[in-house]
């Protein structure tokens, strides 16, 4: 069962504590919002800092909550973000990838977007699995036109990578699990 828990760690702690004590947590992964930390948006940092001196701390707290839950559960864990100020907060990422490296799982992910992963708890980084015969990866993330859906489009987790991570980290005693 996949359970998404929204809110701060303080809001979620009663349910998280129950899950960690009574259920088998098999994987924890976080997707901190990149709007305030990705270097692609650095030109707006000063303006944001004037409005809220702690704007990047708030984003880092999401990542830290993921790390804390992962460590408490004992399960493999990670969080992702594009190239960002997180390297200065959490250190060098454990891994990086581009979506096109996993087109063997989803050919629609044939694009570039360097994404960093900070991981622990025995997380296994999947080996690249590229679909043969595809054209060179495109630059759709950087070329996305302005609009209401631009941020959602740019921040969507590549399906091929998600499937690869699932297969690399799924519980070994139940090999019949399938990706949703």
Regions found by a protein language model. Give the residues of each.
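Conserved acidic residues
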Residues: 2, 26
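General small-molecule cofactor/ligand-binding pocket signal
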Residues: 5
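A conserved beta-strand element that flanks and buttresses the S-adenosyl-L-methionine
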Residues: 29
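Class I S-adenosyl-L-methionine
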Residues: 8, 12-24, 34-178
């Amino acid at each position: 069962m996949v359970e998404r828990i929204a809110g701060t760690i303080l809001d979620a702690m009663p349910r998280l504590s129950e899950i960690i004590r009574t259920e088998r947590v098999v994987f924890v992964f976080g997707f901190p919002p990149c709007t305030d930390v990705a270097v692609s948006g650095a030109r707006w940092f000063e303006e944001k800092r004037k409005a809220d001196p702690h704007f990047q701390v708030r984003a880092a707290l999401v990542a830290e909550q993921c790390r804390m839950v992962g460590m408490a559960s004992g399960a493999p864990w990670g969080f992702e973000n594009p190239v960002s100020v997180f390297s200065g907060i959490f250190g060098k990422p454990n891994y990086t990838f581009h979506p096109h490296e996993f087109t063997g799982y989803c050919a629609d992910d044939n694009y570039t977007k360097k994404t960093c992963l900070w991981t622990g708890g025995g997380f296994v980084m999947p080996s690249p699995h590229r679909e043969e015969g595809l054209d060179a990866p495109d630059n759709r993330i950087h070329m996305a036109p302005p609009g209401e859906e631009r941020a959602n489009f740019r921040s969507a987790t590549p399906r091929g990578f998600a499937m690869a991570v699932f297969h690399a980290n799924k519980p070994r005693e139940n090999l019949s699990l399938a990706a949703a």
